Amino acid sequence: MKLQLVAVGTRMPAWVTTGFEEYQRRFPRDMAFELIEIPAGKRGKNADIARILQKEGEQMLAAIPKGNHIVSLDLPGKNWTTPELATQLNRWQLDGRDVSLLIGGPEGLAPACKQAANQSWCLSALTLPHPLVRVLVAESLYRAWSINNNHPYHRE
C-alpha cells in the first residue's frame, strides 16, 4: 500500500520539510509515503476565496490516482485515538487500495474534496496551521505503523 499526502502549499518552512521527511523516510518500502504539493491560490484583500478553494480542490482531486481511498482531514471528521488509527491503517492495508490524505490550505478543503472523500479524519478539535498538520499526520501514521508492527517507537 502507498500513502499519499496531498497538501495545499509549496513553500514550507525548513522545519516542516525536515519534520515531514524524518517520518517519511522511516516508513518501510512496502508502505511508501509520498507528498504531493498543490500550489496555493493567490490570496489578497479582494481575493475570491470560493474560486480559490474550487481551483485548489480541482488540482488536489486531479493529483489522486483513480481508485485510491480518499481521506479528508477536516474538523467534522472522526477523531481517532492512536490505537484506533493503527486499526484504521491496518484496515486500509487489508483493503488493498492506496490511500490519499487531503490537507487543505488556510481556508480548509474545497467542498468537492470533502464530497469525494471516503472518510474524514479530524486530527484535532484545535485549529492548526496547515504546515504543522503535515508533520503531525506523518508522525501519527508512523506511530500507527509502529504499533501494527510491534516496533518499539510507540510506548503505552
Curated annotation (Swiss-Prot):
Q: Pfam families, per this entry? A: SPOUT_MTase
- Which chemical reaction does it catalyze? pseudouridine(1915) in 23S rRNA + S-adenosyl-L-methionine = N(3)-methylpseudouridine(1915) in 23S rRNA + S-adenosyl-L-homocysteine + H(+)
Q: What is its EC number?
A: 2.1.1.177
Question: SUPFAM superfamilies of this UniProt entry?
Answer: alpha/beta knot
Provide the alphabetized UniProt keywords. Answer: Cytoplasm, Methyltransferase, rRNA processing, S-adenosyl-L-methionine, Transferase
Positions bound to S-adenosyl-L-methionine = 73, 104, 123-128
What function does the entry list?
Answer: Specifically methylates the pseudouridine at position 1915 (m3Psi1915) in 23S rRNA.
HAMAP family this protein is in?
Answer: 23SrRNA_methyltr_H
Q: How does the annotation summarize its subunit structure?
A: Homodimer.
Q: Which family does it belong to?
A: Belongs to the RNA methyltransferase RlmH family.
**The name this protein goes by in its record:** Ribosomal RNA large subunit methyltransferase H
Species annotation = Shewanella loihica (strain ATCC BAA-1088 / PV-4)
- What is the gene called? rlmH
